[in-house]
Amino acid sequence: MRRLPLDFRDQYFGCEIKLTGINRATAAHALADLFGTCTEHSGGGYDAYRVKDLDGKEWKIVRDSSIHLESRRRSVLTGETYKVELNSPKLEYGEMEKLQEVVRSLRRAGGIVNDSCGMHVHVDASKHTPQSLKNVLSIMYSKEDILFAALKVNPARIDSYCQAVDEPILEEIRKLPSGASMDQLKDRWYQGRDGSDYHYHSSRYRACYGKKAIMYPPFQTLIVQRQKL
């Protein structure tokens, strides 16, 4: 079996985790309490809150309009501030426990998820090659059913925001020669129409999303799933 040219423990990653049940200010203060630091409300279009951990890495709490807001307590009035998305900084494998503690702190603060909530995992692939990306797509395709079942992906998301690998495109990518360039891979991914600068290109709604993989390092793969806090 051919192995990828790098150990996943050597790869950087980051997460976007969507939740509700608490407002953005409460979520930010939960992180600040965990780290023993302060919050900064920078606002803007995403109503961002910033919190640094003890390593100086910045975590963000932002608005995500796709979330269906709710509260655990009926007596609490909810509003747009209850649409919460956590953006982690660039993390190393050894910081997985830190991420877990962050999620636990949000849960203790009252954070919950519903069918509108999901999780994106961004994986650094600056060391990947066109061949290794081909391998990743093939592996994802062969294991998708198992992954979707294990992660309990919402069936509605499989038809919309978390679609399976596009088989015709995968077959075209597989046919590329071993020495294929990143530009050739990009051409197959976008079917001859460069959509790399279009943020909402249809390929972003695949479980394995390679848009930034074939544009510039660091490469990001997005795996979208329903995630319980």
Segments and roles (model prediction):
Residues M1-V113, S126-L229:
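C-terminal accessory/tail domains of diverse enzymes
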Residues D115-M119, V123:
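Short, conserved phosphate-binding/catalytic loop or strand-edge motifs used
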